[in-house]
Amino acid sequence: MRKLSFLDRVVEEIDSYARFTKHPLNPNRKSPSANTVDGQLSDNDKKHAAGLMRVDYTGEICAQGLYRGQASVAKSAQTKEHLYHAADEEYDHLAWCAERLEELGAKPSLLNPFWYWASFGIGATAGSISDSLSYGFVVETEKQVMKHLDSHLKNLPVNDNRSREILKQMYLDESEHAVEAQKAGGKKLPKPVKAIMKLQSKVMTTLAYRF
């Protein structure tokens, strides 16, 4: 099997990015909201729900970038496979959020290309150091995503049942990813690194909610 050159890998990643940002997306799993009906939602309810779901969509874009960046330089085939599998599950989340945004009459954040490639760079940097550090980033990323999801579940409009079902399943999946990464040997990240990740996350959520 021919070994991919650096240029081949760049083209492959650009193609992958184009694939999972081209709508409509085709998830491997049916949306958790498929059999759920919303209650009455006002225009303000829809606007607020759309802002939260846009943040969650962008969070999944970041996770895709991080995982694919890590996988591109992973030391072992097992780690590479693990990360690509996690990215595939995150693809379902992207599709669910994209569908819900469309239902709410909204679009994904305009800044998603920046967040994806920034996350890809962070992932590739961490992955080039060691697989254990790479897994450590997965654990911390999933923990932060779970905090966002928990907050959004509490702040969604009361009658937004469809968004709620999506976020509940996403929370379960993210929790599983964190546990798997920890079992795979995830290294605890230094406090300064965690602080930077939290700051980046705060900036992302603030901007993505608005546009």
From Swiss-Prot:
Signal peptide annotation: none
Q: Where does Fe cation 1 bind?
A: E60, E90, H93, E174
EC main group: oxidoreductase
Family annotation (InterPro entries): COQ7_proteobact, Ferritin-like, Ferritin-like_SF, Ubq_synth_Coq7
Which region ranges are annotated with the description Disordered?
22-43
In this chain, composition skew of type Polar residues spans 28-42
GO biological process: one example: ubiquinone biosynthetic process
Residues binding Fe cation 2 are E90, E142, E174, H177
> What's any one GO cellular component for it?
plasma membrane
- Name any cofactors this protein relies on: Fe cation
Q: Which family does it belong to?
A: Belongs to the COQ7 family.
Q: What does this protein do?
A: Catalyzes the hydroxylation of 2-nonaprenyl-3-methyl-6-methoxy-1,4-benzoquinol during ubiquinone biosynthesis.
| Identification of the protein by name | 3-demethoxyubiquinol 3-hydroxylase
Q: Which organism is it from?
A: Francisella philomiragia subsp. philomiragia (strain ATCC 25017 / CCUG 19701 / FSC 153 / O#319-036)
As recorded in Swiss-Prot or TrEMBL, the protein's gene is named coq7
